[in-house]
Amino acid sequence: MRFTKMHGIGNDYLFVNCFEEVVQDPSRQAVLMSRPHYGVGADGLVLIEPSETADFGMRVFNADGSEAEMCGNAARCIGKYVYERGMTDKTDLTLATKAGIRQMRLSLAGDKVGRVQVDMGSPELNPRNIPVDLPGEIVLRYRLKILGQSWLITCVNMGNPHCVIFVKDLEAIDLNTLGPMFENHPIFPQRTNVEFVRVTRRDVLQMRVWERGSGETLACGTGASAALVAAVLSGLSDRTVQVQLLGGNLELSWNAEDNHVYQQGPAAFVFDGEWLA
């Protein structure tokens, strides 16, 4: 089975062109291929599929085999893949995901895709739809106790669930300990992604992310979107920001008119390979 490794600011996935290849058990395949020493090593497996409702379809499987609803970094990589591999000549594309249809706009540098803008859709704030088992119509700076310490959490769904915590010192966060405890906390029936965010200016956020099913990653597009929404709701940032992640930077804007979050950033090829197992 042929595949291509790509990354969006360090959030790396193995992409399979399902116009040409067949993946019988993508969940199991994601686990096997994502292992760094026994497989290829990646944050997960992404299938590029035909779609009856959009230009292309996307399915994302995390490193533990669970299926994600949406991934902004993977979406940008697909935009670059389908254009540069000659699968389309369009620069405005639609992508079918488990979270719905997403619009993408490709910015070209010659015959290559330099950057991709993804319409991440509207944030869902109702706890019943995130989902998070807490009362009320919004979870904004709710006090949650973990390991004897109180954390103020804000919950947002950007196609998948996110828990955002604002901190003063990102380096002091023991993410390998705290990440799984937030991810698997009983208030999150479908688990959650976790973002620790430091606001350096009203237009700059720094972030570390613990992804549901993958652990700490260098970047997360839906997580960056959730961080922006949480920062605006908390009165900590403007609606247009740069989010600085371990793998690089993303530009995001939460549009007040259509309520959509727009994300822009790069995507890169790493290598093509063939899985023989």
Model-inferred region functions:
Residues 86, 129-131, 143, 235-236:
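Glycine-centered secondary-structure boundary/capping sites
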